[in-house]
A protein has these predicted regions:
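Aromatic- and Gly/Pro-enriched helix-to-coil junctions and flexible linker segments
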Residues: 1-62, 132-138
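Noncatalytic modules at the cell exterior or secretory-pathway interfaces
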Residues: 72-75, 126-144
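Extended, low-complexity, turn-rich repeat/linker tracts enriched in Gly/Pro/Ser/Thr and Asp/Glu
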Residues: 66, 79-87, 143-148
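Extracellular and analogous surface-interaction loops
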Residues: 59-71, 125-130, 161, 188-200
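Short edge-strand/loop segments of extracellular domains
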Residues: 79-82, 92-101, 154-166
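Extracellular secretory-pathway ectodomains of glycoproteins
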Residues: 147-200
Length: 200
């Protein structure tokens, strides 16, 4: 009936108040954890004003920010302010390192999606990172009818105090393709017992 009547406006006095949106220039986790221990930036990329979706995949060196292995408490990824936050639709920043014994390790130092905040591990859970490695940036940009020159996504990392060893260690979010053939995982290789410890 309302639509057939031409969708007349209701009583403006009954309009709900606008929700308080977070300040896009600030780290959302900073209100809980303080400023991050360090921030890394992606290589600059110019987002074209009018085009199809744009993918930016690059590697950057990770060195000089920590001097020993440390446990990550939380991470957050966002576009630069003010325009980068408008064009970065979603993305991942993955730190790849060696553990000193020749074993490769990897874990996220930032994941972003529209409307998503940062990622904080539960108390007593941390992700171990090493002083040197490579950050793989995989960023999806969507044009906004305005060129955004030299956009640099930013990944913020909060660490546990030096010397802290959490009860549980995680590698964060991991990607794999089940049933992918020889050498790959099969669906029945992954067993998640009910009521077990959850670290994400």
């Amino acid at each position: 009936q309302w639509a057939k009547s031409g969708a007349p406006q209701g009583d403006p006095a009954l309009t709900p108040a606008q929700p308080k949106l977070p300040d896009a220039s600030e780290w959302q986790l900073a209100s809980e954890l303080g400023e991050p221990d360090f921030v890394v930036k992606s290589p600059p990329y110019t987002v074209t004003a009018n085009a199809q979706d744009q993918w930016w995949v690059r590697n950057t060196s990770f060195a000089g920010l920590i001097d020993e292995p440390r446990y990550v408490r939380a991470t957050e990824l966002k576009g630069s302010y003010p325009l980068g936050v408008k064009v970065l639709h979603h993305g991942h920043a993955q730190l790849r390192s060696n553990d000193g014994n020749g074993n490769r390790t990897s874990g996220p130092v930032g994941r972003q999606g529209v409307g998503k905040g940062g990622d904080r591990f539960p108390e007593g859970t941390g992700m171990l990172i090493y002083p040197e490695g490579t950050i793989n940036w995989n960023l999806h940009y969507f044009p906004i009818n305005e060129a955004v020159p030299n956009e640099q996504a930013e990944a913020a990392v909060w660490l546990y105090p030096k010397g802290y060893k959490p009860e549980f260690q995680t590698r964060g979010e991991q990607f794999f393709a089940a049933d992918s053939g020889p050498g790959g995982l099969w669906a029945n290789d992954l067993l998640l017992p009910p009521n077990s410890v959850k670290s994400q």
